[in-house]
Amino acid sequence: MKLMTKQIEKAARKQYNLGSDLDQNVVAKFFDPCGSWSWFVMNQDPDNPEYLWGIIKGFEVEQGSFSLSELQNYRGRLGLGIERDISFRPQPARGILHMLLEGKHV
């Protein structure tokens, strides 16, 4: 499965100038189907599309950058890679962060 579609790239690059500001949308959700990690994409640098910025739910919930190629190349248990949640629709980043910090599923 392709993680970044043209539509997601366009939306993420459009928000690049917002940086880590939570007053923007999360435009995509990636997840490990064999684990509990999730990555919520907020923006992407148009000049360096390798790196994405967003919210990461791993051992803890945090904001930060993550590598698109690392996500694309990762193979976990059972040989499965990171997937994109195809039912996810853009949502305000602030709301997603608060839900995750409260232990809710997004």
Predicted regions and their residues:
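Catalytic phosphate/metal-binding cores of nucleic-acid and nucleotide-processing enzymes, i.e., regions
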Residues: M1-V106
